[in-house]
Amino acid sequence: MSVLIEIHQFPCLNDNYGYLVHEPGSGRTIAIDTPDAAVYLAEAEKMSWTISEIWNTHWHPDHAGGNLKIKEATGCKIIGPAGEADKIPGIDRRVKGGDTVELGGATATVIDVPGHTLGHIAFHFPDQEAAFVGDAVFALGCGRVFEGTMEMMWESLKRIKKLPKKTQLYCAHEYTASNAKFAVTIEPENKALKEYVAWIEKRRAEDKPTVPALLERELETNPFLRADLPEMQLAMGHAGNAAATFGEIRGRKDRF
């Protein structure tokens, strides 16, 4: 039987989501990234939890900026990507793809997802069908390719695509409404996308989150995850080349 974890999601900064993940059996709590130390500490107090570890997906300040203040307040350990260890404030343990990290009785696997940054990682809890993906992938979107190449980013998205379809993707930002506007320019006739967009509009009108995103739904609707489809490659002018098709879609989004 899989170990229960509790995921507490809350908004912080302009459009980030914060995540506290708690394993009741051990009483341990991890912070996934640290956009805003004060908000994280307040949310932990509200839940009567104490942050025991921080797990960073990448080095950007809206993901690791609160590390040192939270560490000072709680004495927590900080786990982060080995490839960005020099940029992760207060890092104690360096991890890379294939490593495992523990939260009490729950185990997460580290996945290398470079592209947005060169050392970007994700944390996948297979038994709990949850993946914390940082800025690698969003609902109907993916991160801008700041440090890596389009080929690198596509390989990262392929790793995410291989996760079980029922995996919930806990993305780091509420970008879904703007991503949806772009997605319909790529696949205007996609029926699943039209239904998803209607749901997104309703959720946002009610000021409710659209995250987490179900991988199964993303595979049917997220243009960035669909670059391996022959019809998508043809439409983007790169028949037989998924990486180039992805690059074309990403370039269009950058200019959108």
From Swiss-Prot:
Gene3D superfamilies cross-referenced by the UniProt entry: Ribonuclease Z/Hydroxyacylglutathione hydrolase-like (3.60.15.10)
Annotated binding of Zn(2+) 2, by residue: D62, H63, D135, H173
GO terms of biological process kind: methylglyoxal catabolic process to D-lactate via S-lactoyl-glutathione
Cofactor descriptive note: Binds 2 Zn(2+) ions per subunit.
Catalytic activity reported: an S-(2-hydroxyacyl)glutathione + H2O = a 2-hydroxy carboxylate + glutathione + H(+)
Superkingdom field: Bacteria
Gene Ontology terms, MF aspect: hydroxyacylglutathione hydrolase activity; metal ion binding
InterPro entries, alphabetized: Clx_II_MBL, Glyoxalase_II_hydrolase, HAGH_C, Hydroxyacylglutathione_Hdrlase, Metallo-B-lactamas, RibonucZ/Hydroxyglut_hydro
Keyword line: Hydrolase, Metal-binding, Zinc
Gene this protein is translated from: gloB
Family label: Belongs to the metallo-beta-lactamase superfamily. Glyoxalase II family.
Subunit and interaction comment: Monomer.
Cofactor(s) named in the record: Zn(2+)
Residues binding Zn(2+) 1: H58, H60, H116, D135
UniProt keyword Thylakoid present: no
Coiled coil location: none
Species, as recorded: Hyphomonas neptunium (strain ATCC 15444)
Enzyme class, UniProt record, top EC level: hydrolase
EC numbers on record: 3.1.2.6
Function: Thiolesterase that catalyzes the hydrolysis of S-D-lactoyl-glutathione to form glutathione and D-lactic acid.
Pathway(s) it belongs to: Secondary metabolite metabolism; methylglyoxal degradation; (R)-lactate from methylglyoxal: step 2/2
Protein's name in the database: Hydroxyacylglutathione hydrolase
